[in-house]
Amino acid sequence: MDMQESMMGRGRDAIEMIVDAGSFAEGVVGAKSFDDPDFGPGAVVGTATLQGTVCTIIASDGGAMNEKFPVVYAGIIGLEEGYKMAEAVYASILEDAEKPLAEKRPLVLIVDTPGNGPGKVEEIFGMNKSTAAYQLALAEARLKGHPIIAMVIGRAISGAFLCHGLQADAILSLDAQFGTMIHVMPLTSVSRIIRKDLETLEVLSKQSAVFAAGPRFFHSLGGVEALVETLDGMRPAIVARIAEVRAAKLEGRQDDLGPWGRGKLGEARGGRIERPRVIEMMTRDFAAVADRYAPSR
């Protein structure tokens, strides 16, 4: 496998590669203007067209640093960044509230983030509330009919990927030759938490998709719908996926999209073989006690 030029830290470049030339208007989504350059500088939000279709763009800026929060740099999604991204999603929902399902604008997420910014101040104020707000916003947009496509161009790691990517209808990723990484946490952190030596985990990472960091392993789990082989391939892949997602929503096939759809895809690819059994067991066990939790009438 020949290594290609990395896109890590190049979220802004990726935007220009994907959208119609010169169409990206940063800081404006619908009627919402993001006028404060010091609020969430690591989050890039705006409006562009993609083959003439208006879409919302949300990305992390690998070259920005939030001076109010020292741990927020190099694409990390911090407290302010999470809220800023959520605001962009809600502005999109509001702008298209009266439009039919076929005209809801797509949301394109450019993913390159090494994680969240869990500094002391962020934890005190509620970093989890910020990332949860962004996740909820994307889930609401998805269920209201907006096609949401995540394009992994570099790092998709930990809780930052949980909020900036995993709520999408479909996830695409540049293939492994671009150095893309998708995983929960570095093996060094896993080693400390589960008390296994690093050497053992490195062996496991070559055998198990759960421990591995590359996009191909995540693809086998169904977490990535498709791998993109070239930089020029990002734009047509996103355009095609938007059309597929929109068609599925118009046909009422929501369960084929988003987290639930990726679960089924992983099962079909043989990467999540225990999933059906666990779901069946949980459904059976809950049915046995469901009456206790039924709402009072």
Model-found features: residue ranges?
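A generic local secondary-structure boundary/capping motif
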Residues: F34-D35, V45-T47, L94-K99, L138-A139, ...
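Conserved CoA-thioester-binding segment of acyl-CoA-metabolizing enzymes
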Residues: M1-G22, E26-D38, V44-T56, S60-Y83
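A structural preference for short, pocket-lining loop segments at secondary-structure junctions
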Residues: T53-D61, M65-V72, E80-P118
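Amphipathic alpha-helical segments at domain termini/boundaries
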Residues: M1-D35, V190, R195-R297
